[in-house]
Swiss-Prot record:
Pfam families to which the protein is assigned, alphabetical: Phe_tRNA-synt_N, tRNA-synt_2d
One GO cellular component, as annotated: cytoplasm
Gene Ontology MF, one: tRNA binding
Protein name, entry field: Phenylalanine--tRNA ligase alpha subunit
InterPro entries: aa-tRNA-synth_II, aa-tRNA-synth_II/BPL/LPL, Phe-tRNA-synth_IIc_asu, Phe-tRNA_ligase_II_N, Phe_tRNA_ligase_alpha1_bac, Phenylalanyl-tRNA_Synthase, tRNA-bd_arm
Cofactors: Mg(2+)
Cofactor note: Binds 2 magnesium ions per tetramer.
Catalytic activity, reaction form: tRNA(Phe) + L-phenylalanine + ATP = L-phenylalanyl-tRNA(Phe) + AMP + diphosphate + H(+)
Length: 338
C-alpha cells in the first residue's frame, strides 16, 4: 500500500508541474483527489487491511493528500500570476500616445448671463427662488394688484390655457408664492422663462427670460432700490450711463424703468435701441400695499421693492449682440463665440 501511495504521489506531482493552464490543473485535481479519483480508489482498499495497519496507512494517505493539495495550490498561484502578466502586456497603454479629443462644452450665453446676474445678487444677500411656468390667473394677475377688469391686463398679451391657467407673463408670480410661505424679511431673486404674445423682432420674442428681484423688510426705501440696481449695473456694465425714468406697473408704486446706454451706438441712436440711445433692461418700483395684503403682510409694518429684468437684453449689451433671435437659432457658428 505504501509503494502504491508513493507512486501515486510522484505521478500527481509530475502531472501538476507539467500543467500548462488552470483547466488542465483542475482536471488533475479531480483525477487524483475527486470522489472517484485515484486516491479515493486506494482508500477503498483499506477495508481489506488488518486492523492494526489501518491507522498507519491512513496517516500516509493524509500526508500524500496534503502534499498533492499543496502542489496544486502552488501551481494554481503560478498559473494565475502568468495570466495576469499576459493580460498586463496585452492591455498595456502607451502613455506617449495622444489622447482622444473631447470638445469642451460651453455655456449658452443666456445661461452664462443668468449665472453672472445671480452671482451679483447672491453676493448682496439674496436667495435664489423658483416657481411654475404654468400659472393660475390669480398668481399671475390678481395677487399682483391686477384684477380681471384692470386696464393693465391689456398691456400684456397672454397665452391663456384652460381652467384659468396661463403661461406666466412674468416671474413676479413667484413673489406671491414665496411671500405666502415665508415671513419677512425677504430677499429673493428669481430667474426663469416667461411667455408673451409678442411679435418676433430683433428686440422681442414670445418666449424669453427674466430675473425677478424682491426685497421686503422694515424701512426699505426707493433709495435702497436705486442703490441696489445701480450697484448691479456697475458690476455688469462698468461705468456705462444708466437712467431711471418714471413708469407704471400695477404691482409697484412708485414705478420706474431702468435703461442702460446703448453700446452699439454709444447713445447716438440706432435700429437696436429704436433710435433712442438707450436699452431698457429692467422695470422696478416699491411694492404696492395691495400686494402685501394679498399675502398676509401688514403694509403698515413692512415695505419692499421689486424689479424685473430681461436677461436677453442684458446679454445683448454684454456680448454686443444686436438681434435677440440669434439666441434661439442653435447656430454653432454663433454659440462657439462665447
Amino acid at each position: 500500500m505504501q509503494q502504491q501511495l508513493d507512486a501515486l504521489q510522484l505521478e500527481a506531482l509530475k502531472a501538476i508541474r507539467e500543467a500548462a493552464d488552470l483547466t488542465i490543473l483542475e482536471r488533475i485535481r479531480v483525477d487524483f483527489l475527486g470522489k472517484k479519483g485515484k486516491l479515493s480508489a486506494l482508500l477503498g482498499g483499506m477495508a481489506r487491511l488488518p486492523a492494526e495497519e489501518r491507522p498507519v496507512v491512513g496517516a500516509l494517505v493524509n500526508q500524500v493528500k496534503a502534499r498533492v493539495e499543496e502542489a496544486l495550490a502552488a501551481q494554481q498561484t503560478h498559473l494565475q500570476d502568468q495570466l495576469i502578466e499576459l493580460r498586463l502586456v496585452a492591455e498595456a497603454l502607451d502613455v506617449t500616445m495622444p489622447g482622444r479629443f473631447v470638445p469642451p462644452g460651453r455655456l449658452h450665453p443666456l445661461t452664462a448671463t443668468t449665472d453672472r446676474i445671480v452671482d451679483v445678487f447672491v453676493g448682496l444677500g439674496f436667495t435664489v427662488a423658483s416657481g411654475p411656468q404654468i400659472e393660475t390667473e390669480y398668481y399671475n394677475f390678481e395677487a399682483l394688484n391686477t384684477p380681471a377688469d384692470h386696464p393693465a391686463r391689456d398691456m400684456q398679451d397672454t397665452f391663456y390655457l384652460s381652467d384659468g391657467l396661463v403661461l406666466r407673463t412674468q416671474t413676479s408670480s413667484v413673489q406671491i408664492r414665496y411671500m405666502e410661505e415665508n415671513d419677512p424679511p425677504v430677499r429673493i431673486c428669481v430667474p426663469g422663462r416667461v411667455y408673451r404674445r409678442d411679435q418676433v423682432t430683433n428686440r422681442h420674442s414670445p418666449v424669453f427670460h427674466q430675473l425677478e428681484l424682491l426685497a421686503v423688510d422694515e424701512e426699505i426705501t426707493f433709495g435702497d432700490l436705486k442703490g441696489t440696481l445701480t450697484f448691479f449695473t456697475q458690476e455688469m456694465f462698468g461705468d456705462r450711463p444708466v437712467r431711471f425714468r418714471p413708469s407704471f406697473f400695477p404691482f409697484t408704486e412708485p414705478s420706474a424703468e431702468v435703461d442702460v446706454q446703448c453700446r452699439f451706438c454709444d447713445g447716438k441712436g440706432c435700429r437696436t435701441c429704436s433710435h433712442t440711445g438707450w436699452l431698457e433692461i429692467a422695470g422696478c418700483g416699491m411694492v404696492d400695499p395691495n400686494v402685501f395684503q394679498a399675502v398676509g403682510y401688514n403694509p403698515e409694518k413692512v415695505q419692499g421693492f421689486a424689479a424685473g429684468m430681461g436677461i436677453e437684453r442684458i446679454a445683448m449689451l454684454l456680448y454686443d449682440i444686436n438681434d435677440i433671435r440669434l439666441f434661439y437659432t442653435n447656430d454653432l457658428r454663433f454659440l462657439r463665440q462665447f
